[in-house]
């Protein structure tokens, strides 16, 4: 399947872009992002964009978007505006952000040695570290695995 950016968005439902990364505005849009691309990861940052740690990770993701474009499509979700997944993924009031990986409609579990393999919810300051994580997740998914261990 050839990937077309935002091809799954209907003409009258354009999403605003935050420096090139689409912001998903509804549970339906999140579902479509997870389902859409069968050859790349869907990396979704669920979070509260007004909080500092979320801003830091958003900046990191924005800076890597084009470097990782062949492996991943990235999306942002404001969990205060779109709360469809807050209970499912256990996002609480004290959560600033959580980055989650999806592959062909499957949630990918990543072991970060934090005890929570569902999501990456700590700040990564090193671009190469995040690139390495995405590469490991992507390669694991291409091999048919739905879980992997972080290289860091």
Question: Where do the model's predicted regions map?
Answer:
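Amphipathic alpha-helical interaction motifs in eukaryotic regulatory proteins
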Residues: 31-35, 47, 55-58, 62-69, ...
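Low-complexity, flexible helical/coil segments
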Residues: 78-83, 108-115, 132-140
């Amino acid at each position: 399947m050839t990937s077309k950016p935002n091809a799954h968005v209907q003409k009258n439902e354009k999403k605003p872009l935050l420096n090139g990364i689409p912001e998903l505005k509804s549970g339906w849009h999140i579902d479509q992002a997870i389902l859409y691309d069968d050859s790349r990861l869907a990396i979704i940052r669920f979070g509260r964009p007004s909080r500092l740690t979320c801003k830091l990770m958003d900046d990191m993701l924005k800076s890597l978007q084009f470097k990782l474009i062949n492996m991943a499509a990235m999306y942002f979700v404001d969990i205060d505006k779109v709360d469809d997944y807050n209970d499912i993924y256990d996002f609480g009031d004290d959560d600033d952000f959580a980055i989650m990986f999806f592959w062909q409609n499957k949630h990918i579990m990543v072991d970060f040695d934090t005890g929570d393999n569902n999501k990456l919810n700590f700040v990564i300051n090193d671009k190469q570290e995040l690139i390495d994580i995405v590469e490991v997740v992507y390669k694991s998914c291409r091999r048919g695995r739905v879980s992997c261990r972080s290289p860091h």
